[in-house]
Amino acid sequence: MLENTLVEYMDTSDTPWCWYYLADCGQWHQFEDDPDLPFSSEAVENFYLKNSKAVLNTSSFSYKGQIDFSAMLLTDLTTGRQKRIRRSYNTEKRCSCFSLAPVFWESFDPERPYQLIPLSEHSPEYQTVDRYVKTDGLLDRTILSINRIQNLDLWELYCRKKKQLMRIQGIKEIQERRLFHGTDIKNVDYICKYNFDVRLAGQHHGHVFGKGIYFAKHAALAGKYSKSSLEPLPVYGGKTQLVHSGETKIIFLARVMTGKPVAGESDFQKPDHRNPENLHDSCVDVVSHPKIFVIFDPNQIYPEYVIQYS
């Protein structure tokens, strides 16, 4: 959501302007290239045309930022980091390296298939995820650990899929959600390494809304599909995991491209099962207020966090 703190009308034109930020790689990226930025060039341009001296505040699940048009700066309000921004024609050549590792990944090792990084409970990232799990996810349990999954291969596939869907559908934004998936702790290593496997989905719980990978809006619901275990979380490229006494459960918090949903049926193998055209991107239980989502292409999923709780 964008908030315009100053409003003043300016003359508009038909010039196809776009907005760019200077990335850590030293190249200019269009705002749409970063999935974490909750605003598009078009939205920013509309506010700029109203007042070129305005200050915009914006927030999403994982990002709180501010754009100062006078200073031409983009500020991350959580970390205080600033990036230069500029306004230019949309014909400008764009840098394509946006799918490199996100800047907040720590101790990133590109030689490893993935890393499972425990978050400090005092970090803003931990507190954001913890609050989302309990408030939006309705999980009334004691969270023992939150681990960030750092898998560059899966991240690149997700970014490419997002650009492909937007290009095919002729849209500038596609609906993304943070959704939960419950599973056994023995599956953590496989999912972190290879992503969720549609071929293995529904083996134990059926295919009520389609033969795909199931996600829940609420962590409490996803937790019902996670078995209690005495096993510790696997360690791969991260710090040594604490061994918690007693049985624990795990759930994944994933970034999911749900796009345009359609009501699912048990025999569906893709959202538009009986239509040769792909008009929808996911299946749901109830289109108006979905709580269950079914994804048929793993590239529409990036597993972001593993959450362990008792």
Please give the residue ranges for each predicted region.
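Residues in well-ordered beta-strands of folded domains
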Residues: Y20, T75, R86, N147, ...
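Segments that shape or occlude catalytic/ligand-binding pockets
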Residues: R167-I171, R177, I185-S310
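Short coil/turn segments at secondary-structure boundaries
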Residues: L6-V7, C25, E32-P35, S70-A71, ...
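Eukaryotic intrinsically disordered and solvent-exposed regulatory patches
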Residues: E3-V7, S40-V44, K50-A54, T58-S62, ...
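Internal glycine-rich, Lys/Arg-flanked active-site/core loops of soluble domains
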Residues: L100-G210
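Beta-strand-rich binding-surface signature
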Residues: D14-C18, N51-V55, K64-Q66, A71-L73, ...
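Eukaryote-biased intrinsically disordered, low-complexity acidic regions enriched in Ser/Thr/Pro
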Residues: M1-E121, E125-T128, G137-D140
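Conserved beta-strand elements of beta-rich interaction domains across eukaryotes
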Residues: D24-Q27, F61-Y63, L73-L74, T79-R81, ...
